[in-house]
Amino acid sequence: MKVKKNIIYNDLTLLNALQILQKVKNKTLVIVNKNLKFLGTLTDGDIRRALLRKVKITDLVQGIINHKSIITYDKKYSATVDKKFRKFKISLLPIIDKDKKYVGFHEFKKNKISQNQFVIMAGGFGRRLGSITKKIPKALVKVKQKPLLEHILAKAIKENFEHIKIITYYKSELIKKFLISKSYKNVKIYKEKRLMGTIGGIKNIATDSNNLNYLITNCDILTHVSYKSILNFHISSNADLTVATQMKIVKSQFGNVHVDKRNITKFEEKPEHMENIVIGIYVLKKSTVELLKKIKKNKIDMPDFINFLIKKKKKIVPFPFVEKWFDIGNIKNLNDAKKNY
């Protein structure tokens, strides 16, 4: 039994809860009132799904608490407790007393994350970074004295991903040399014989039939959002593909006019509109990877594959980011990451 950790009060905002969730191991919060009466639980996925329903990030957690949480009165990790974990596929089981007050929680002792693959796409040329990537691959560009690849690997390893693969092409030998110098365990490197697009390279590494899901990130994406949270969201959504996204206000560089036949009916000075942008982190179910492997083309880009899945009527869900993240795709973004990551 564990206590204190993972508890929040019901008057915190969703943003507060998300910030706390990124720091806790099992990605589940226990919600109580000021008298420590147990009210329910809340996961990262609960919050993300609420945001997709247009709930505001500044709203209180009180409005989206899972009041039907599975609980136990047993303070010892018994066979009954273990059975509940396996039956309901949960990672945290709150313990309450006869007065419905929260006293602690159990964590599931089996770590299922080892059944999932973590893949870093690091084959691109990184041409938008100019002279920086003429000598080194983008994956080895440094932010806060560490290569991008080292930041991503440290985060994945900390979150207990046990099977990590890196797909390379451009200056692959430098990435291999870096990995050897760090003596990483359970990290394998694969060099493409030719560029296979932003997702095609997965075909060559998807050989382990025991893997349930593949979490894929571009090597130039830095975020403090938990990879495990994205994976858990994908699993709980029963999605074929999960795409990390964020709503962004885009301002036009030009004025815009509305025309009705020959007449201008409205003028807008550099109008703004919302776009749901793709971040560069995905989770694919095993069966989705099998579909990818059946495509005969060697070079496959993610937009084409997503449209292919849409035609197949597969379940594709967004994982909405509200947190800041960094796409190290150009000099401006690199400098931003060096300052703010």
Question: Where are the model-predicted features located?
Answer:
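A conserved hydrophobic position in a structured secondary element of the catalytic/binding core
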Residues: L42-T43, Y170, T217, V259, ...
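A short, conserved acidic/glycine-rich loop-to-beta-strand motif
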Residues: S237-M247
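Conserved N-terminal catalytic core of the sugar/cofactor nucleotidyltransferase
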Residues: L52, K146-N218, S229, K297
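Catalytic-core segments of class I nucleotidyltransferases/pyrophosphorylases
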Residues: L215, L222, K228-L231, I235, ...
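Short acidic/polar active-site loop segments enriched in Thr and Asp
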Residues: K27, S91, E162, L212, ...
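Bateman/CBS regulatory modules and CBS-like beta-alpha motifs in cytosolic regions of diverse proteins
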Residues: M1-I20, V24-N26, I31-K34, F38-L39, ...
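N-terminal nucleotide-binding beta1-loop-alpha1 segment
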Residues: H106-K134
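Active-site metal-binding loops of divalent metal-dependent hydrolases
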Residues: F125, C219-I221
